[in-house]
Amino acid sequence: MEEKNYEVNKKYDEKILINILKNFDKTGEYVVEPGRNEIKKFEIYIENNLKKGNEKKKKNNNIENTETKKMVNVKKFKQKDFIINFFYKFKGSKAKRSYEYAKKLLEYKIRTPEPIAYFDDFVNENNKKNSYYISEELKYDFTCREVFWPEDIERDKAEQGENYKISEETERMLAKVEKNREKIIRQFAKFSFDLHENGVEFEDYSPGNVLIKDKSGNYEFYLVDLNRMKFGVKLNLDKRMKNVSRMMEDEKIARIFANEYAKYCKQREDLVFRYLRHYIRKHKGYVYFKDITRPVRNVFKKKK
């Protein structure tokens, strides 16, 4: 019996989702432009999608269209070569892992956009096979990048000078983050501690992969880009600080994080900070090495 290569959340209509995939290249709005992977958002109708509990809505003609619509994100994974696809047969494709890991996170009450479906080896109208992961589009306020990397914003201002322009909405958001930075960092430290206590090791725990909602000063953290995760892992302090070290670089910010994390893990603050600083510096060195060797690596890629 052939293994099923897709799964759809029971709340959603499979036919609607398949139609989106068939027309992926021609419709939808880009969230992430084509590159290694690409993400588009699509609008679907909830009343056509829910199988139960919608009878009352159908009777009410005054319901606005916005109440019956839902935005979803569809991530299309880049095609892999034969060898990688062979290994995916055993550990699951990135699309499948994203879907299954999202469900598992929700079981742990760890926030992530609602998983809707995954499809492996889906053949589109151009007769090309790709894998897709579909999830709800999350309306968030900012990411960990704005919280932990304020120096990036200052660098952009310096480099662009008079050409530096951002919307009023973005300016208000950055001002709010600046005002509440320490509070957000401390709440994120508690979130990270809970993640580790649940035995979850998010291997891509980086600033762009944590979306944040501001609920009147209480911050909700959502994990995205989930295909590299481990569950049921016993994490000592060394592994925990290594896990979060890609999230930050500024030592003042790291000290705030370490101070708060130490309260929950019942370890000395200086010890937590020492582990964290060690891995921050190690990762910084790794990034620097990659940057200076990039031209050489690009030459070899071209030869291939």
Label for each model-derived stretch:
Residues 18-142, 158-166, 197:
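Conserved ATP-binding subdomain of kinase catalytic cores across diverse folds
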Residues 122, 212-214:
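Short, low-complexity Ser/Thr-rich regulatory SLiMs
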Residues 205, 210-212:
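Hydrophobic residue at the +6 position relative to the catalytic HRD Asp in the kinase catalytic loop
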Residues 219-298:
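C-lobe/activation-segment region of protein kinase-like
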